[in-house]
Amino acid sequence: MLLKSPDKSPEKILKLFDEVYSKARIFYLLRTAIDLNLFEYLSSFKTAKELAEILDADLILMEYMLKILNELDLIESKVVSERIYYKNAEITNIYLKKDSNYSIINPIYSYFENIKNWENLADILKNKSNCSNMDVDNFFPKVVRRMADECKCWELQKVLNYMAKYEEFKNAKKLLDLAGGHGLYAIGFSMLNRNLKCYVFDLPNVIEETKKFIKKYNAKNVFTITGDFYKDDIGKGYDIIFCSYNPGGKNPKIAEKVYNALNEGGLFINKQFFPDKEEGIEDYINNMEWNFSKPEGLKKGKIRYTFEGDLNLNDYLKYLEDLGFKILEVVDMSELLGLDENSSSFRKSANPSDSLRFKDNSPAKMIVAKKL
């Protein structure tokens, strides 16, 4: 046996593990950089020695860490008198510094928390029922804060500016942000149309977070309504109802409530994920992770971002038409978020495939429908 080679070389398997291991090391290096607040110290140029002293870190390891971050385009370098100096790249100052208005450090920490599930995958596989239940009362407020930090740095502005072109929006007097969470969309809409009164409807514990954002942005025309949209009345007389990434966003019963709550000629703007099929390993991994947890009170589907009673995109559009809506357009969110006439480098540095939520050929769509 010692002198006989196997029928196949181990190269493929070794290469697979080598590639995965390399990416895992980068992941933990990035986590360490954020945990150590490394980027907070690199607003101006510093040497590896200076940074090592500040962080009380090993100099050799710090030198390599900075070289790696430089290769990842998160920091830039210059050489002065044979010394290498490093400072944050512009995109790092925007998104990876705590004092930035567009910091996404909080959403990024969800990766660091979620990786623990993969480290304990054997336990989850064998004992899912014992470790998968999640307290919705604590879950949603935490998610709301992260979604606020995430959306305000790109998606929020893109959606607001896109919808501002509609005459129906310009003439609207009353808007409902249904299951609006942080309420940033309602706040933004109220800034674009000063005659618009906006209402954010969500669960009581979530609304407590909403109120903090309303106060932060001094949004005088934004108000809150507490309730469960599956069970409670959502009100009437709205000119616009806006819906974004919520569990009932593809549910026909919620769509009917929306129709009944809108004025004639009113707009229903619904931004949701409509996954229709699994297309390879990335979908398999995401869907597997989706099934790690089961928040109490939410009946999740097998596929990521789906829930019991959901309709697929085509069936949902047909249902809206049967209710009495006219579909004005269906916007591909990856295209909407991927266009920036002011930045030629956008597709390289901040395109949807690099964001926390979107990728090319994203199943996320924004439906704009009008009640006839």
UniProtKB/Swiss-Prot annotation:
InterPro entries: COMT-like (IPR016461), O_MeTrfase_dom (IPR001077), Plant_O-MeTrfase_dimerisation (IPR012967), SAM-dependent_MTases_sf (IPR029063), WH-like_DNA-bd_sf (IPR036388), WH_DNA-bd_sf (IPR036390). It is an enzyme of class 2 (transferase). GO terms for biological process: biosynthetic process; methylation. Pfam families: Dimerisation, Methyltransf_2. S-adenosyl-L-methionine binds at residues 202, 227-229. Keywords: Methyltransferase, S-adenosyl-L-methionine, Transferase. The keyword S-adenosyl-L-methionine applies. GO terms for molecular function: O-methyltransferase activity; protein dimerization activity; S-adenosylmethionine-dependent methyltransferase activity. Its EC number is 2.1.1.-. Belongs to the class I-like SAM-binding methyltransferase superfamily. Cation-independent O-methyltransferase family. This is Uncharacterized protein MJ0086. It comes from Methanocaldococcus jannaschii (strain ATCC 43067 / DSM 2661 / JAL-1 / JCM 10045 / NBRC 100440) (Methanococcus jannaschii).
